């Protein structure tokens, strides 16, 4: 929300300085985000170039004589601007002036041997824009000798506040002035709006077919207007807050929107056919809006239509067909009340952001619907002339204020601050609330412009933000001599350790949205009605995510689109299987794209630049589970994963027959097509909350590290097994042959060929043997090897490859 200081003072009688106003705004909850104060431009004056001759020693410089309008002799200025010429009127900086755009304080100096007494400035040097190809060139009637900042209306600071969604009353300059006055920083000026008598009825009638979408509608015809440019003061205010002046009629509606928080719309009455009907839009109905784009409407949107069709998207944007232009002579002024939720949903679905939508979706003051028409009528008559008809009001039955029972003691109970009863009631009264009664519990009537206030806690908040939250005395946090229990829960510890484990593996942590498109949710097992948002922040963020993978895959693709195709990302966060509290899961997930392997990415002379695959994802998943405390040696890997993985290049990690701890693999081509991404791409998900809790054991000191004094030995074995035998089964069989001596088993080769026989394959393993009590003899190694072969043969049917 932007406004100028002079605009604020139209509604607030105050002698407070800009700094005091800014400080007070923030202290009462209207956080100031930025102040554009051009006070540094006060020393710059409008000056006229009398002569411009070539510099004697520089081809690109000119020597100017400049009249600064101070009644003294013209000054000499050396200038390099290509547009410097006799007769030009621009902005002049005298010696001693600080020029913000170049961060220099001017002095009298010589430029290539010629003295220069000041500077003719460009827009960039005054920080007005990036334009620096020439000095500022003002109109011929610009008053020489006067302040440039005053002439260009740069001496009126622009204040921007960052509004929270619960403050619709502060979407107007008047509402902000009301808050400042309530805080004691000035007096609020009268808000009375003159009632303009009309001549005859407004011939266009209004029919409301959807009262649930439009509880009130006011319409007024003004005949004989002249729609030209708006006056300079109005244009300057709109420009200051970032709006583009269009015409007097349109500028009036924009002005009232910001001045009083009342969005309006104007129709060219000659372009309206028949009466106006407020109804639900028909499915597939189209309208060309004022932004020049055609929009397709749906039945959950509200439209204003006539015999020609839709003339306006209610509460969001008007239609081009009935818009006002320079030929408009008869105008219909519309002021209506629109359902906030419908307005917000319509704007999000169509992708339209307007100042009207911003206010209607937060809630406007219903009691200012008719006064808004009167205010706009007065401005139209003053700026465009014309003759008004009577105002047509349909549907609005008046505002019935809500009454809240307010115990005065709530202020102390909720804040710990003793605010006198009289002060509390006085603050509420200054804010427009109406306390009734004098006991310790008073009934408070809520003002029509505060739909955000609902109960007694809200009233306490209103009292405290005006009384001053800085009056709450700081309290130190309680200190404990010792912590007798765990600070973090098991799930929190697992989340932290999983993040560390994945980061160590070269993956970067990402934080993605919990909301994803419905199409993506369905690809990953979601899409249930219970997981659809009632009020999504965007049309493509409609479902709670059933998996972390869609967000991570999309993030990896965005990196690839920007030239970073080899990327490894992970996230540890929540997923949703339903809307129950017990249906939210804690998941660690990750994706690798391109050649982003554990040992590096990109092309290399060492030849490690192959694409990522299923085993990269498997290793990541196992590492995450191990960090979470899962018994890795007991995990079972089953071929095949959920439908979003490639059926032949994916797997499921289980602990026992029923407990699924994770999935991993390369993604199915249809999944990648549905997400509109490219590969190579693999990923994994492990369910952190599914890892069983370790059994409670008496606390023991960690045993000392005992290292064997004997040399470790490695032996290789190659077994021929059926193709259906998994490598993991063979590895576990080899490990079980002697758990005391065998410390590790790893697969280093898999071979299939006709020489092995039909449906056979060879798996080669490396067995690490660590003697503990003595150096093993050849006979010991032979006996151990025999046990390995026997155990593998017993559990897998494998035989040593000859």
Swiss-Prot record:
Catalytic reactions of this protein: tRNA(Phe) + L-phenylalanine + ATP = L-phenylalanyl-tRNA(Phe) + AMP + diphosphate + H(+)
NCBIfam families per record: pheT_bact, YtpR
Occurrences of domain tRNA-binding (ranges): 38-149
Cellular component terms (Gene Ontology): phenylalanine-tRNA ligase complex
PROSITE patterns hit by this protein: B5 (PS51483), FDX_ACB (PS51447), TRBD (PS50886)
SUPFAM superfamilies: Anticodon-binding domain of PheRS, Class II aaRS and biotin synthetases, Nucleic acid-binding proteins, PheT/TilS domain, Putative DNA-binding domain
Lineage summary: Bacteria, Pseudomonadati, Pseudomonadota, Alphaproteobacteria, Hyphomicrobiales
Domain annotation B5: ranges: 399-474
Annotated ranges, domain FDX-ACB: 708-801
GO MF annotations, alphabetized: ATP binding; magnesium ion binding; phenylalanine-tRNA ligase activity; tRNA binding
Cofactor binding remark: Binds 2 magnesium ions per tetramer.
Disulfide-linked positions: none
The protein, known as: Phenylalanine--tRNA ligase beta subunit
Protein's UniProt keywords contain Protein biosynthesis: yes
The EC number(s) this enzyme carries: 6.1.1.20
Residue positions binding Mg(2+): 452, 458, 461-462
């Amino acid at each position: 929300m932007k406004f100028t200081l002079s605009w604020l003072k139209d509604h607030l009688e105050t002698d407070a300085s800009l700094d005091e106003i800014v400080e007070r705004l923030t202290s009462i909850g209207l956080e100031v985000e930025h102040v554009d104060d051009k006070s540094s431009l006060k020393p710059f004056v409008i000056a006229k170039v009398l002569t411009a001759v070539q510099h004697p020693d520089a081809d690109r410089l000119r020597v100017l004589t400049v009249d600064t309008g101070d009644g003294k002799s013209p000054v000499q200025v050396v200038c390099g601007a290509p547009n410097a010429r006799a007769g030009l009127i621009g902005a002049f900086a005298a010696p001693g002036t600080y020029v913000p755009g170049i961060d220099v304080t001017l002095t009298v100096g010589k430029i290539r041997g010629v003295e220069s007494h000041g500077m003719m400035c460009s827009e960039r040097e005054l920080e007005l824009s990036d334009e620096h190809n020439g000095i500022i060139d003002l109109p011929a009637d610009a008053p020489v000798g006067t302040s440039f900042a005053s002439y260009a209306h740069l001496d009126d600071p622009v204040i921007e506040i960052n509004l929270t969604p619960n403050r619709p009353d502060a979407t107007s300059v008047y509402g902000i002035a009301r808050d400042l006055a309530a805080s004691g920083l000035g007096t609020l000026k009268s808000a009375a709006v003159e009632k303009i008598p009309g001549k005859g009825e407004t011939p266009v009638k209004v029919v409301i077919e959807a009262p649930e979408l439009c509880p009130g509608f006011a319409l007024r015809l003004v005949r004989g207007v002249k729609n030209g440019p708006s006056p300079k003061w109005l244009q300057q205010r709109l420009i200051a807050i970032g709006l583009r002046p269009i015409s007097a009629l349109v500028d009036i509606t924009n002005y009232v929107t910001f001045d009083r928080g009342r969005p309006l719309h104007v129709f060219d009455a000659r372009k309206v056919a028949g009466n106006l009907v407020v109804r639900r839009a028909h499915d597939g109905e189209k309208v060309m809006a004022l932004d020049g784009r055609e929009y397709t409407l749906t039945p959950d949107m509200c439209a204003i239509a006539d015999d020609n069709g839709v003339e306006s998207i209610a509460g969001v944007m008007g239609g081009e067909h009935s818009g006002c232009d320079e030929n408009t002579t008869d105008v219909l002024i519309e002021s209506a009340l629109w359902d906030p939720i419908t307005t917000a949903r319509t704007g999000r679905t169509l992708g339209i952001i307007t100042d009207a939508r911003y206010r209607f979706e937060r809630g406007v003051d219903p009691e200012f619907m008719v006064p808004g028409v009167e205010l706009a009528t007065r401005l139209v008559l003053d700026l465009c002339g014309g003759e008004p008809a009577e105002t047509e009001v349909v549907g609005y039955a008046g505002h019935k204020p809500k009454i809240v029972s307010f115990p005065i003691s709530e202020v102390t109970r909720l804040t710990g601050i003793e605010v006198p009863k009289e002060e509390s009631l006085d603050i509420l009264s200054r804010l427009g609330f109406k306390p009734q009664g004098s006991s310790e519990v008073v009934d408070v009537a809520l003002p029509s412009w505060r739909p955000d206030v609902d109960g007694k806690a809200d009233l306490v908040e209103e009292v405290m933000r005006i009384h001053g939250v800085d009056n709450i005395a700081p309290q130190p946090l309680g200190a404990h001599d010792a912590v007798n229990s765990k600070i973090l829960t098991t799930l929190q510890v697992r989340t932290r350790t999983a993040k560390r484990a994945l980061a160590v593996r070269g993956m970067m942590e990402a934080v993605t949205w919990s909301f994803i498109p419905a199409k993506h949710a369905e690809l990953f097992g979601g899409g249930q009605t219970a997981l659809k948002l009632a009020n999504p922040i965007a049309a493509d963020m409609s479902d709670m995510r059933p998996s972390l993978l869609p967000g991570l895959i999309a993030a990896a693709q965005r990196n690839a689109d920007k030239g970073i195709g080899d990327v490894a990302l992970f996230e540890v966060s929540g997923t949703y299987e339903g809307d129950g509290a017990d249906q939210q899961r804690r998941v660690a997930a990750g994706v690798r794209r391109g050649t982003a392997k554990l040992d590096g990415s990109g092309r290399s002379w060492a030849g490690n630049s192959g694409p990522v695959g299923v085993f990269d994802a498997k290793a990541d998943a196992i590492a995450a589970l191990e960090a979470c405390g899962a018994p890795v040696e007991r995990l079972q890997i089953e071929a095949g994963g959920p439908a979003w993985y490639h059926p032949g290049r994916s797997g499921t990690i289980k602990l026992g027959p029923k407990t699924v701890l994770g999935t991993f693999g390369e993604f199915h081509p249809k999944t990648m097509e549905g997400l509109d991404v490219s590969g190579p791409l693999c990923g994994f998900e492990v369910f952190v909350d599914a890892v069983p809790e370790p059994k409670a054991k008496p606390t023991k000191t960690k045993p000392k590290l005992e290292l064997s004094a004997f040399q470790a030995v490695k032996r290789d074995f190659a077994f021929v097994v059926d193709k259906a035998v998994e490598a993991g089964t063979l590895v576990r069989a080899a490990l079980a042959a002697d758990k005391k001596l065998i410390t590790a088993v790893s697969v280093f080769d898999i071979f299939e060929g006709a020489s092995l026989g039909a449906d056979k394959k060879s798996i080669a393993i490396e067995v690490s043997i660590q003697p503990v009590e003595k150096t093993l003899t050849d006979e010991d190694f032979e006996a151990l090897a025999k046990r390995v072969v026997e155990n593998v043969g017993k559990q897998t049917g494998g035989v040593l490859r000859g």
